[in-house]
Amino acid sequence: MAAAPSESIPSVNKAWVXSEYGKTSDVLKFDPSVAVPEIKEDQVLIKVVAASLNPVDFKRALGYFKDTDSPLPTIPGYYVAGVVVKVGSQVTKFKVGDEVYGDLNETALVNPTRFGSLAEYTAADERVLAHKPKNLSFIEAASLPLAIETAHEGLERAELSAGKSVLVLGGAGGVGTHIIQLAKHVFGASKVAATASTKKLDLLRTLGADLAIDYTKENFEDLPEKFDVVYDAVGETDKAVKAVKEGGKVVTIVGPATPPAILFVLTSKGSVLEKLKPYLESGKVKPVLDPTSPYPFTKVVEAFGYLESSRATGKVVVYPIP
């Protein structure tokens, strides 16, 4: 079956839309009748159940990468979890009714989709999606894709392997919470250290950190211990390079990077989510939701305001989406 009955897929849907660049509180508007996207041969149409917000969303709204952005108006939202309601003719991995999740944009900063996940329906390339782990709710699944894929790609680039030590800068954030878990449970790190503020140290330990460093009280770069890998998720490579062993690796997702640190931007792949599925299904790797999540669809602007305040611990999720 290639599609749900066409009468059950409307021609328009509710969505949050940005028609100009600026602060999310100024430019994001609710629109009850945006056209539902048409799918290409290698895409599926998803009935969105939950979506998660990411700093890249508000940076995009501010026009930080407008030179490579897709043309306005756009619907924000990179992370999606939902149900397939239609499949393109070349799609082989999914069928109508499948529960899926993923990061809609293969490359975050270059021509991201105009039809993001903050809508009732979105179109997604088959290759960026994975089957939702059965033990995860849609809210939990929506919190994962870009964050857990970024954590995984950085650890691979840093060549973390069993027996090596790693220091995570920003361990309580959306990406950092997954770096700790993957380093410990997937890559087999011998020691995981991570930084956070005082109130978030217990979270680091719960996630598997052997050493929780309070950055408000001590400077990690001054510690006598050095690490095989330093993963910077906050933008402090000038300090990170002082905490790595000679011959070790420093990776960052926030530029500019102080050499020899490596700055990278994620290439999103559903295959990484499929690879991590056993760890998610066994409970070794867990989603980390901000305590304020989920926000209802009517409160998207408030959800962005909270994310932009840098107070979030884990992911900010929007659910239910009508």
UniProtKB/Swiss-Prot annotation:
Question: Which residues does the annotation say bind substrate?
Answer: K59
Per the UniProt entry, the Enzyme Commission number(s) are: 1.3.1.105
Can the keyword NAD be found in this entry's annotation?
yes
The record's catalysed reaction(s) read: 4-hydroxy-2,5-dimethyl-furan-3(2H)-one + NADP(+) = 4-hydroxy-5-methyl-2-methylenefuran-3(2H)-one + NADPH + H(+)
Instruction: Report the Pfam families cross-referenced here.
Output: ADH_N, ADH_zinc_N_2
* GO MF annotations in UniProt: furaneol oxidoreductase activity; zinc ion binding
Q: Which CDD domains match?
A: MDR_like_2
Principal EC category = oxidoreductase
Query: Ligase among the record's keywords?
Result: no
- Kindly give the InterPro entries that the UniProt entry links to this protein: ADH-like_N, AOR-like, GroES-like_sf, NAD(P)-bd_dom_sf, PKS_ER, Quin_OxRdtase/zeta-crystal_CS
Give residues annotated as binding NADP(+): K59, G174, V175, S197, T198, K199, K200, Y215, I253, F264, V265, L266, R311, A312
Lineage, top-rank taxon, reads Eukaryota
Q: Which UniProt keywords apply?
A: NAD, NADP, Oxidoreductase
Instruction: Give the family this protein belongs to, as stated in its UniProt record.
Output: Belongs to the zinc-containing alcohol dehydrogenase family. Quinone oxidoreductase subfamily.
Q: Which PANTHER family match?
A: CYTOSOLIC ALKENAL_ONE OXIDOREDUCTASE, NADPH-DEPENDENT ALKENAL/ONE OXIDOREDUCTASE, CHLOROPLASTIC
Question: Whom does it interact with, and what assembly results?
Answer: Monomer.
Biological function: Enone oxidoreductase involved in the biosynthesis of 4-hydroxy-2,5-dimethyl-3(2H)-furanone (HDMF or furaneol), the key flavor compound in strawberries.
Q: What is this protein called?
A: 2-methylene-furan-3-one reductase
